[in-house]
Amino acid sequence: MNVYDRLEELGIKLLDPTPKGGIYSLVRPYGDHLLYVSGTAPHNAVDSNMAGKLGSEYTIEEGQEAARRCMINIISNLHHELGDLNRIRQFVKLLGFVASAPDFYEHPQVLNGASQLLKDVFGDEIGLPARS
């Protein structure tokens, strides 16, 4: 499966590298086969970041879309680092942070937006990491 063909089938366009909010690397290679990837906000080419809390200002579905947008940004950053997303052999770990109201407990469902995108683009064997 060619990752770029799959992205096109899903209607996903890769973006320019994510603007950084501090002094750090978007992607940091470690050894020959591992990349550490910085997190990113859910901005896209059309509108700015979502700012607010799940459970009070945003629904679970809107949170899932934000998580999906974050993953598109991460995949875009990986493309710019690697030059070819087909080089990726496995995603090992997905760590997600969700800003939420005090009585919101559906964080796993929100992060499914990012996990589902990885699975849809890369398949189960490559795109289904452990998650926290």
Outline where the language-model segments fall.
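Short, polar/acidic, helix-capping and beta-turn segments at strand->helix junctions
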Residues: M1-S132
